[in-house]
Each structure stands twice: as structure tokens, then as C-alpha cells.
Amino acid sequence: MISNFDCTDNQASSKVLRPPGGGSSDIFGSEMPQTPRNVKNRMASNIFAAEKDNGVKNNVRQGAHRFYFIGDAPRRGQKTVDSHSRLFGEPTRPITPGKNHMKSSIPFGQNTEAVAAQKLLTTNGHYNGKSGSVSSASSSVSSSTENLKMNSGSRSGEKRLALTGAGK
């Protein structure tokens, strides 16, 4: 081993040490076995080469689904079982029929009283908004006509004259 430190000589040493990693960087003085560097040539094409074992590598996929290995199928659709379902089983739900949206509400060739009774059953007797069969204008006319019939007893002669125009 070569030593640059000499206590008896007070001259400055003119030797330059080798940079780290160059030549022999062994500080203990023994020779290191030379092994070739294992660098993958990323520019080499392997289109026609035989596939290597992908199962040998332990590649964990990064990102949202990182808890399975690349090449494995992702674990989707696993049913989570809560304690209520585990203890008591699945709840039984009554089957409700879906509404037929294509069914027409216009009666063609049917008895109008039967249709009115059917509508009364389906609406539970409530008429809100446009679902009622009688419009507000026609109901006000019919109610005023009924009021005339009921109140015609006291002044029937005056009304008849006013209606016929004979009083003038």
C-alpha cells in the first residue's frame, strides 16, 4: 500500500489520487472481483423475441387499483356482507309492478261510466290539477245554471220576461 503521509518530510505531496469509482476504490486493500454491469438496453427491439415469464416479476400495479399484481384479473364485484345480512339473511322485499307508461288514458269505445269508476279507483278519489275530468270553466257554468233553477221560485215572472225580451 502506498502512503502519501510522511512525518519526516515536510514537503507537500504532488501525487493526485484517483477519483472515486475509478481504478481501485477498495479502501481495505483487497482486490474486488470484476462483474459486468447489468444494464438493460432499452433501445433494443424485442417484438419477435419469445416472451419472458411475467409471473416471475413481482410487479405491483401503481394507481387506484394497486392491490393486485399485473397479469392478475382485478377483484371487482365482490359482495360485501354486513353483519345484519350475515345474521338474519337477505331482507325480502315485496315485488311492485312497474307503471305502464305506454298505456293510453283516452277511452276509445269504452263505457264512460266504467272509465270514470276506473279513474276514481286509480286516483284514490282525488282530483289535483289537470287530472280532474271537469274543467273549472264548465263547472262554474253548470253551477250558475243550477243556482238559477233553484232561485227561480220567487221572481219567476221577472226572469221569464227578461229572458224572452217581452217586457220592453
From Swiss-Prot:
Family label: Belongs to the MAP Jupiter family.
GO cellular component: cytosol; microtubule; microtubule associated complex; nucleus; spindle
Comp. bias (Basic and acidic residues): 76-87
Modified residues (Phosphoserine): 24, 105, 133, 144
Signal peptide from the UniProt entry: none
Gene Ontology molecular functions: microtubule binding; structural constituent of cytoskeleton
Main subcellular location: nucleus
Regions of compositional bias (Polar residues) in chain numbering: 1-14, 145-155
GO biological process: positive regulation of microtubule polymerization
Organism: Drosophila simulans (Fruit fly)
Extent of Low complexity compositional bias: 131-144
Residues annotated with Phosphothreonine modification: 35, 92, 96
Lineage of origin: Eukaryota, Metazoa, Ecdysozoa, Arthropoda, Hexapoda
Protein name, entry field: Microtubule-associated protein Jupiter
Record region (Disordered): 1-33, 76-106, 124-168
Known function: Binds to all microtubule populations.
Keywords for the protein's UniProt record, in alphabetical order: Cytoplasm, Cytoskeleton, Microtubule, Nucleus, Phosphoprotein
Annotated InterPro entries: JUPITER
Subcellular location: Nucleus; Cytoplasm; Cytoplasm, Cytoskeleton; Cytoplasm, Cytoskeleton, Spindle
